[in-house]
A protein has these predicted regions:
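Divalent metal-dependent catalytic cores for phosphoryl transfer on phosphate-bearing substrates
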Residues: 47-49, 55, 67, 79-198
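C-terminal end-of-chain micro-motif
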Residues: 1, 199-200
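Acidic/His-rich, divalent-metal-binding segments that scaffold phosphate/diphosphate chemistry
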Residues: 1-112, 116
Length: 200
């Protein structure tokens, strides 16, 4: 269970303190008017709970900050020039594609007494079939410009789970090689998903 209001307040604080780019205010207003803060992160795989999407985004942010802080202790760190704005954008907004993506449906399940009852569950209601990471890039770009590094990080954050990779596309290897920050955001996403979140 997550505290939706506490997570929303923390998300807004991080966003407003770090993201100052032109158009970011309009994007934040759109987010606040959307289901972002109450949506699940998935229908069944991780954080499939009320407020799971915002919680996941914060977890990815925290993991990325921790990874970059550790990497930057090294003299030859690849991340010394990554701004706090880029970290916030690439992690807090990486799953923007999930806004208005899930809906609650009902199914019949036997309870502990053997009686059938209707229980809610999340289903996918795809309104903009534009992919996953690339859809998030597209949606963000409707409000503000992304740097190439941010776009790559958001676009490829799914890593090997990305449908393009599953289909045989090898672009991800080139992207991770050319844009180390994209690799780091993917690792932060995996850590958040498998180490920090509800998977029931």
């Amino acid at each position: 269970m997550v505290d939706v209001e506490l997570n929303k307040a923390r998300f807004l604080q991080i966003y407003e303190e770090n993201i100052k780019r032109e158009g970011s205010d309009k994007l934040l207003k759109w987010l606040c008017d959307s289901d972002f803060f109450v949506a699940p992160a998935s229908s069944k795989f991780h954080n499939a709970i009320l407020g799971g999407l915002c919680d996941h985004s914060l977890n990815v942010y925290d993991r990325a900050v921790e990874l970059i802080e550790n990497e930057n202790k090294k003299e030859n760190s690849l991340f010394k020039n990554v701004s706090t704005e880029s970290i916030a954008i690439s992690t807090l907004l990486h799953d923007l594609c999930k806004v208005y993506y899930y809906k609650v449906s009902l199914r019949n399940v036997k309870n502990e007494f053997g009686t059938w009852e209707q229980v809610p569950y999340y289903t996918v209601d795809e309104k903009l079939p534009y992919g996953h990471g690339e859809k998030s890039v597209y949606m963000i770009s409707g409000f503000m410009r992304l740097t190439r590094e941010e776009a790559m990080a958001i676009n490829w954050h799914m890593g090997g789970f990305d449908k393009r990779v599953v289909g045989g596309d090898f672009s991800i290897s080139k992207a991770f090689s050319q844009f180390p920050f994209a690799t780091l955001v993917h690792i932060a996403d995996i850590m958040a998903t498998y180490f920090d979140e509800d998977r029931d």
